[in-house]
């Protein structure tokens, strides 16, 4: 980990993503959906942007925050758990915040949780005083223990955290949990959630004030158009003027109805709905006067 350093001038935006692992493929798919394409180098660590001056650097996920802090990369797609861990570690040694989460991306969800042996009777954070807690996220854990006023020993491990209590090297663990199957296999029970994590787009606290700043703004806008619309549906139908208010009451969770003129005295209406529309809901709209109902998926949009 290093303090923020001045990086050589660049006119191309550079994004760091995981070379391999659970975030790698979704990250590349998301950026491709934003209209980016690349030419890969022979070592497959650097991808030169062809559609736009936006290049990819393929690295380990725990290197991404440092690359942003040092100005080597402008943006990165990384788990919030990794970003928050390194940010907490920087603060604990007196370094300023050098990066921030700009957008949640809706994939790679997991939780950073305390897990105790199944025979424990969990009574709350005060119970942890004097215990040994194994974790790969020591900075987040130390910060949380300090907030709780609990004095416990943090045992830092780089992997296989869940086996530490069985080996006698720790009393409990603080680790990432997705399905919980690994905890159950090691006779551990989750008892407290420290962090809800997902993949995020991270960037420097201060955006570049050159051409890269404009590229960053454009990419953020495109990301919003892809991510925010992923689960939304465009609903289109016809209705007479006297049925519009009643139909709007059935769509209170949707965006305001857009009215478009149509032949025969009817209106063409459309709205964006937050999620799938069931057959039951469509039939309810039909009974209220909607005709020619159509539900369309939205691949991307610009607000």
From Swiss-Prot:
Principal cellular location given in the protein's record: cytoplasm
Stored Gene3D superfamilies: 3.30.70.120, Periplasmic binding protein-like II
Molecular function GO labels: ATP binding; ATP phosphoribosyltransferase activity; magnesium ion binding
GO cellular component annotations of the record: cytoplasm
Residue stretches spanning the membrane: none
UniProt KW Amino-acid biosynthesis keyword: yes
Catalytic activity: 1-(5-phospho-beta-D-ribosyl)-ATP + diphosphate = 5-phospho-alpha-D-ribose 1-diphosphate + ATP
Top-level taxon: Bacteria
Coiled-coil annotated residue ranges, if any: none
SUPFAM superfamilies: Periplasmic binding protein-like II
A single BP term in Gene Ontology: L-histidine biosynthetic process
Record InterPro entries: ATP-PRT_HisG_long (IPR020621), ATP_PRibTrfase_cat (IPR013820), ATP_PRibTrfase_CS (IPR018198), ATP_PRibTrfase_HisG (IPR001348), HisG_C (IPR013115), N-reg_PII/ATP_PRibTrfase_C (IPR015867)
PANTHER family from the UniProt entry: ATP PHOSPHORIBOSYLTRANSFERASE, ATP PHOSPHORIBOSYLTRANSFERASE ATP-PRTASE
Function recorded in the entry: Catalyzes the condensation of ATP and 5-phosphoribose 1-diphosphate to form N'-(5'-phosphoribosyl)-ATP (PR-ATP). Has a crucial role in the pathway because the rate of histidine biosynthesis seems to be controlled primarily by regulation of HisG enzymatic activity.
Protein name (database record): ATP phosphoribosyltransferase
Gene: hisG
């Amino acid at each position: 980990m290093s303090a923020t350093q001045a990086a050589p001038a660049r006119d191309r935006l550079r994004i760091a993503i995981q070379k391999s692992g659970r975030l790698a493929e979704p990250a590349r798919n998301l950026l491709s959906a934003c209209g980016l394409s690349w030419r890969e180098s022979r070592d497959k660590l650097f991808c030169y942007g062809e559609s736009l001056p936006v290049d990819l650097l393929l690295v380990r996920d725990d290197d991404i925050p440092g690359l942003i802090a040092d100005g080597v990369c402008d943006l990165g797609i990384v788990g919030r758990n990794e970003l928050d861990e390194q940010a907490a570690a920087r603060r604990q040694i007196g370094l300023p915040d050098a990066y921030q989460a700009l957008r949640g991306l809706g994939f790679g969800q997991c939780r950073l949780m305390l897990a105790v042996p199944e025979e424990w009777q969990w009574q709350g954070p005060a119970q942890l005083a004097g215990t040994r807690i194994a974790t790969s996220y020591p900075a987040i854990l130390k910060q949380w223990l300090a907030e709780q006023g609990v004095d416990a020993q943090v045992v830092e491990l780089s992997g296989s955290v869940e086996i530490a209590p069985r080996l006698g090297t720790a009393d409990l663990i603080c680790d990432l949990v997705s399905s919980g199957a690994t905890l159950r296999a090691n006779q551990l029970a989750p008892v407290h959630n420290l962090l809800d994590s997902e993949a995020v787009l991270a960037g420097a606290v201060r955006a570049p004030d050159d051409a890269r700043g404009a590229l960053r703004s454009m990419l953020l806008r495109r990301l919003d158009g892809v991510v925010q619309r992923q689960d939304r549906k465009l609903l289109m139908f016809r209705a007479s003027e006297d049925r519009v208010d009643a139909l709007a009451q059935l769509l209170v969770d949707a965006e305001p109805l857009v009215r478009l003129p149509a032949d025969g005295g009817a209106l063409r209406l459309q709205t964006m709905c937050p999620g799938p529309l069931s057959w039951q809901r469509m039939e309810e709209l039909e009974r209220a006067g909607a005709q020619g109902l159509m539900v369309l998926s939205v691949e991307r949009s610009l607000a």
